[in-house]
Amino acid sequence: MNRQKVGEYFKDLEAILTERNILYKPKLVWNIDETGKSFKHDPVKVIAEKGANNVPGHTSAMSTHVTIVACVNAAGERMSPLLVVRGKTERSVFSFNTREAPSGTMWDFEENGRMDDSIDERWFKEIFLKQCGTDRPQVLITDGHSSHESLALIQEGIREYIAILSLPPHITHYLQPLDRTVFGPFDKQYDRACSEFLQVDKWTFPTLFKTAWYASMTA
């Protein structure tokens, strides 16, 4: 980890928060990050009698990719999640049991199941601006992914008095709040939920995601 870059980042962050008079207003400081999940997962550890050779554990052979986008503030409040599924048309979303996802979940699609500029801009308008409250200014900390730095998104942030700050490259894993405090517990909860199902597919995934989402967000 580059200590100089880390030091510079925290100086910049403090300056931005101080300039906007929100240094001690954690509800106005947000962090967005994404993680990926496939229907092929690692089973949780199974306790068995010593010497047992074949210990059953539920896994899925499918590997469909879903990108999960989360946003939380420094006070511990969360926004509705965004799920990006793999597909070329809206029909790819309809194949999921979307009603079983957490309340308010936003669904979108992309050929590889990844974030892109248009999805990020839609998320900013339809989730972030509607759920961040009316206080201004605010700060949104991102991981530096190109979709979070599009010109259209930055301009929209300026219009809405939302400062968008990127984490330094190559060391986001060390500094990313969601990586450090949410996605780790989420992964464990997700694998635990999956282990109780015989198969993980487009119909069962939203239920499994909801179980892990609420468990990790309230831990």
Predicted regions, residues:
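Phosphate-facing sequence motifs and polybasic nucleic-acid/acidic-lipid-binding regions
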Residues: 1-219
